[in-house]
């Protein structure tokens, strides 16, 4: 619990002034510009859906997973025990870099994760909420890319 509070304080202090929850179309545009549309065969709609269900489009979100003790960082709630510098650091990135609203490090790390054998299934929330959804198109409604 103390670690969580420290991480929350650090993320608050490192979050740029004016950073806030991003709009759906802003997220879609940043992910599109970052090359995620059909990356490894997953449509942009899948990525936007994942971002919503993981963080509600909050690039500075930090949530502790009480089941495994890991902490998720940023838009896609990338876990510290595997992917950033609090654990194995398979993305070669600091966990706090995943909180940047420009999403550059988040997108690059997500690309490494999805290249793994689980694909987007590495995010259980995607499997539950997005994978078999027949309304994925709604995530891009009204967005200009």
Swiss-Prot record:
Pfam families: Lys. Keywords: Cell projection, Cilium, Cytoplasmic vesicle, Disulfide bond, Fertilization, Flagellum, Secreted, Signal. Disulfide bonds join 25-143, 49-130, 84-95, 91-109. InterPro entries: Glyco_hydro_22 (IPR001916), Glyco_hydro_22_CS (IPR019799), Glyco_hydro_22_lys (IPR000974), Lysozyme-like_dom_sf (IPR023346). SUPFAM superfamilies: Lysozyme-like (SSF53955). One of its GO terms (cellular component) is acrosomal vesicle. Residues 20-145 form the C-type lysozyme domain. GO terms for biological process: fertilization; fusion of sperm to egg plasma membrane involved in single fertilization. It comes from the Eukaryota. Expressed in the brain, lung, ovary, uterus and testis. In testis expressed in the germinal epithelium and on the maturing spermatozoa (at protein level). The active site is at residue 54. Its main location: secreted. Monomer. May be involved in fertilization. Has no detectable bacteriolytic and lysozyme activities in vitro. Belongs to the glycosyl hydrolase 22 family. This is Lysozyme-like protein 4. It comes from Rattus norvegicus (Rat). The lineage of its organism: Eukaryota, Metazoa, Chordata, Craniata, Vertebrata.
């Amino acid at each position: 619990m103390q670690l969580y509070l420290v991480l929350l304080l650090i993320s608050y202090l490192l979050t740029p002034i004016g950073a806030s929850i991003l709009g759906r179309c802003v997220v879609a545009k940043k992910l599109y510009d970052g090359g995620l549309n059909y990356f490894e065969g997953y449509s942009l709609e899948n990525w936007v859906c994942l971002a919503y269900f993981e963080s509600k489009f909050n690039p500075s979100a930090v949530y502790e997973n009480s089941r495994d003790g890991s902490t998720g960082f940023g838009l896609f709630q990338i876990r510290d025990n595997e992917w950033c510098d609090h654990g194995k650091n398979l993305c070669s990135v600091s966990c706090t870099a995943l909180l940047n609203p420009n999403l550059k490090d988040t997108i690059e790390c997500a690309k490494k994760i999805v290249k793994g054998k689980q694909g987007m299934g590495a995010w259980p929330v995607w499997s539950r909420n997005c994978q078999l959804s027949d309304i994925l198109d709604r995530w891009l409604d009204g967005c200009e890319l």
